[in-house]
């Protein structure tokens, strides 16, 4: 099996794992999951939600996302900052393409590759990542894939 095909298979596995991780989110409008992988090891994870110590309610009475809700990417990157790991040169797998604010965090964290499975309504985050030289890959989430082929 060639290297490119092997990488594509790994990308699909990790994006499925990020999708499963998104199920931990308490947000009702949208559940997003993220994994940071380096040397084929998951070194951090995150999902969208409220900061530590806040009630796990992401939407207000008008069903709008509260302004202090953290995105999955931000949660994964801040976990790295509190650990002994480094995200320099890592790959981020995220179920929705990053917004512009998360793209800035990804760039500053030294992440070199971003794989996502769902398009966000704005493309400015993706454009910024590409402009900074980060490899950006879209892959469809294959929910019918079985690990037992």
What are these regions (language model features)?
Residues 1-149:
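Zinc-dependent deaminase catalytic domain
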């Amino acid at each position: 099996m060639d290297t490119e095909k092997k990488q594509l298979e790994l990308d699909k596995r990790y994006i499925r794992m990020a999708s499963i991780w998104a199920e931990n989110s308490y947000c009702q409008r949208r559940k997003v999951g993220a994994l940071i992988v380096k040397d084929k090891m998951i070194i951090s994870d995150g999902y969208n939600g409220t900061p530590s110590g806040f009630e796990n309610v992401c939407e207000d009475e008008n069903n709008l996302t509260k302004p202090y809700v953290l995105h999955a990417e931000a949660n994964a990157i801040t976990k790295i900052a509190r650990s002994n790991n480094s995200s320099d040169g890592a790959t981020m797998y995220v179920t929705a393409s990053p917004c512009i604010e998360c793209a800035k965090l990804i760039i500053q964290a030294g992440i070199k590759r971003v794989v996502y499975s769902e398009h966000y309504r704005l493309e400015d985050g993706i454009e910024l990542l590409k402009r900074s030289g980060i490899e950006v890959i879209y892959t469809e989430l294959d929910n019918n894939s079985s690990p037992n082929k």
